[in-house]
């Protein structure tokens, strides 16, 4: 018994050391693993489309090429719209910098706060933070984004093509590599379940984010908020980050509405309420209904995962945090010695329900 406990202790120490080592490797080699992971997640999204195309007697490889080309065209169109908007931001920045000073002076006057443009804390903070330099650099970088990332996009597209090719032949490869029936069924079930759950999560998240961005764009366009395309895109992309992304989108859009429309409180309230309502209705009412149930992951661990992957891979890491956590949880639930980690990653009730679904992997089978 003591030897068994000792071996378990050694195993968990080695597991912890391996996690630390893997974290360091992922941080150092992020330029390689970020495109690879993005391609893997996008492959999960594209897989159902390619599979459905085969029903129309379209060969698998042709379906892959069609889906990738359509995605590339969509990226190109959206990218060009964003580049044009970023150039507009660069040209309009001096106007909004002056507008910020005006708005601040009006607010200071309304609340009887002493205002001196040369010594004001807010103005000095604005200047010391280098907001002007940041906006100019960001706009210039965004303008050249399509050219500087062309290589990365090509690499991701190639990864997607090969991932989708491999997925189709995965079942035969697993059967050949693991001829034992029980082990074969277990591995295939883990792979199938992982693909199904991650595909469902990313697909629903993409649709919700798309409609969120579209509605935010329309509301901003109707009220006349400048750079409506940028606010719509920010709402779309930030919605992939659970909770915090929607909050950040609302703060940025409403903050800019204050900058542009103050002292017209009606328009400011319109923007704030519209963006808040879109995020609340789509994120808290429609999305849970589409998903049917949550992913069974502890909210605290989602927060930890967002922080960890944000530190490792930046903004892209925060977008990928939840899908990666889903994959880890599914694997841990179906490998006996990793079951305790699966329990810690999820809610106890959800884990027990899932465990019943995987019960045919028990040894008696």
Regions found by a protein language model. Give the residues of each.
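Membrane-water interface of transmembrane alpha-helices in multipass transporters/channels
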Residues: 30-38, 222-233, 262-270, 297-302, ...
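Hydrophobic alpha-helical transmembrane segments of membrane transport and translocation systems
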Residues: 268-365
């Amino acid at each position: 018994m003591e030897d068994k406990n000792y071996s378990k202790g050694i195993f968990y120490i080695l597991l912890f050391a391996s996690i630390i080592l893997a974290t360091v490797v992922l941080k150092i080699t992020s330029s390689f693993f970020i495109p690879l992971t993005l391609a893997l997640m996008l492959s999960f999204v594209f897989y159902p489309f390619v599979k459905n195309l085969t029903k129309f007697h379209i060969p698998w490889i042709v379906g892959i090429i069609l889906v990738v080309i359509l995605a590339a065209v969509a990226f190109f169109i959206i990218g060009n719209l964003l580049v044009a908007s970023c150039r507009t931001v660069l040209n309009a920045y001096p106007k909004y910098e002056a507008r910020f000073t005006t708005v601040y002076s009006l607010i200071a006057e309304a609340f009887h706060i002493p205002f001196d443009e040369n010594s004001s804390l807010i103005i000095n903070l604005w200047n010391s933070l280098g907001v002007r330099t940041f906006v100019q650099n960001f706009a210039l970088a965004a303008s050249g984004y399509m050219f500087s990332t062309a290589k990365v996009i090509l690499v991701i597209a190639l990864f997607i093509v090969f991932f989708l090719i491999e997925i189709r032949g995965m079942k035969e490869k697993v059967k050949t590599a693991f001829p034992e029936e029980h082990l074969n069924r277990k591995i295939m079930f883990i792979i199938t379940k992982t693909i199904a759950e991650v595909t469902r999560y990313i697909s629903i998240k993409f649709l919700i984010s798309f409609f969120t961005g579209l509605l935010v764009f329309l509301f901003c366009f109707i009220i006349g908020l400048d750079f409506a395309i940028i606010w719509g895109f920010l709402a779309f992309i930030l919605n992939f980050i659970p909770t915090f992304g929607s909050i950040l989108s609302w703060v940025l859009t409403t903050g800019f509405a204050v900058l542009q429309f103050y002292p017209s409180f009606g328009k400011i309230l319109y923007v704030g309420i519209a963006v808040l309502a879109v995020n609340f209705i789509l994120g808290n009412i429609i999305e849970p209904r589409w998903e049917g149930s949550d992913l069974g992951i502890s909210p605290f661990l989602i927060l930890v995962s967002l922080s960890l992957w944000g530190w490792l891979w930046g903004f892209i890491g925060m977008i990928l945090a939840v899908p990666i956590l889903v994959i880890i949880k599914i694997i841990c639930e179906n490998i006996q010695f990793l079951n305790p980690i699966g329990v810690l990653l999820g809610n106890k009730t959800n884990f027990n329900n899932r465990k019943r679904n995987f019960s045919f992997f028990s040894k008696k089978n």
